[in-house]
């Protein structure tokens, strides 16, 4: 169970880093938002899901 928690935390950190870089780039590029809207929403949905997963796994471990 600890391995799953550590992998979920790593995935959350990696997703956060990718979103931290990609979202400003999408907003700064011309026509970037209209063509990459689905990618940003998918990344945000993945991030929210990982936050809940880390919270659930943390409550099971502690």
Curated annotation (Swiss-Prot):
List, alphabetically, the Pfam families matched.
Answer: Ycf9
Q: Which GO terms describe its cellular component?
A: chloroplast thylakoid membrane; photosystem II reaction center
Q: Where in the cell is it found?
A: Plastid, Chloroplast thylakoid membrane
**Which keywords are on file for this protein?**
Chloroplast, Membrane, Photosynthesis, Photosystem II, Plastid, Reaction center, Thylakoid, Transmembrane, Transmembrane helix
Question: What Gene3D superfamilies would the database entry show?
Answer: Photosystem II PsbZ, reaction centre
Tell whether Cytoplasm is among the UniProt keywords.
no
Q: Does the keyword Membrane apply?
A: yes
InterPro entries xref list: PSII_PsbZ, PSII_PsbZ_sf
Q: What is the membrane topology noted in the UniProt record heading this document? A: Multi-pass membrane protein
State the disulfide connectivity.
Answer: none
Q: Where are its TM segments located?
A: 8-28, 41-61
Chief location of this protein?
Answer: plastid
Gene Ontology annotations of biological process type: photosynthesis; photosystem II stabilization
Q: How does it assemble?
A: PSII is composed of 1 copy each of membrane proteins PsbA, PsbB, PsbC, PsbD, PsbE, PsbF, PsbH, PsbI, PsbJ, PsbK, PsbL, PsbM, PsbT, PsbY, PsbZ, Psb30/Ycf12, at least 3 peripheral proteins of the oxygen-evolving complex and a large number of cofactors. It forms dimeric complexes.
Q: What does this protein do?
A: May control the interaction of photosystem II (PSII) cores with the light-harvesting antenna, regulates electron flow through the 2 photosystem reaction centers. PSII is a light-driven water plastoquinone oxidoreductase, using light energy to abstract electrons from H(2)O, generating a proton gradient subsequently used for ATP formation.
Q: What is the similarity comment for this entry?
A: Belongs to the PsbZ family.
**HAMAP family in the record, alphabetically?**
PSII_PsbZ
Question: What is the protein name for this chain?
Answer: Photosystem II reaction center protein Z
Q: What is the lineage of its organism?
A: Eukaryota, Viridiplantae, Streptophyta, Embryophyta, Tracheophyta
Name of the gene encoding the protein in the UniProt record = psbZ
